[in-house]
Amino acid sequence: MPSQAKAYISLIIVSGTLLVLLAAGSWSPANLRQFLIYLGLAALASALKIRIPGMEGTMSPNFVFLLLGMVALPFWQVVAVSLVAALVQSLWASAKRPRLVQVAFSAAAVVLSSSLAYKFAHFVLVGDGPEFPVVCVILAGSIYLPVNSALVSMVIGLVEGQPLKPVCARCYEWVFPYFMIGIAFAGLVSGVYAPSTVWKGALVLFPTMVLTYVYFMNRSAGALPTTMPPSSSEDEEYFAEVSS
């Protein structure tokens, strides 16, 4: 593996670990019911993963419930939900047994993306995120999508020795419409339900996200080659299940 890829992977893992430790220091038993509901929905959504055509990575609708959680949950709970969601997406029904560093990178990338999205949205709204839930979801989504896509695209490009621009282009071709639909649904739910009851809207929304998953799964299956060419090196298989 190129030294640049190793350095980048290490940087992301260390950054994600520090954020998890920071969030753990703020733990409190408040809003445990809402926390467990968002945690369960995000974990279930993470199992609905789709392989991105032309890339060695997967995507899932877990981000929808992360965005809704950013309206009602404190920072540490959003980080915890992000961590569990990423672990489920990496480990559940993987095409091949993932390596520890691969799982750690995927988890760190999701934690970083959700943390930056949460902090940006609440900074812009000056702590009034719950008062403007739709705006909070839109702001958070506008950060989560590009950051997460860039982190995943960059590691794939570095590991496989490909230019970043075409890797990002392939990623956005599939991820962008998926995210836009999810953000639209999340914004709709956050606008209909009060911040304290957005979790009810999240429960109602879950079947819709399952149908969205089925649609994109069938669409991506038609775009995937019937047989995958053998990899020329172990490095090209290294991040076969990178999550986005």
Task: Name each model feature, range by range.
Residues 1-58, 64-170, 174-217:
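Short helix-perturbing small/polar motifs within transmembrane alpha-helices
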Residues 162-167, 219-244:
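Membrane-proximal helical linkers
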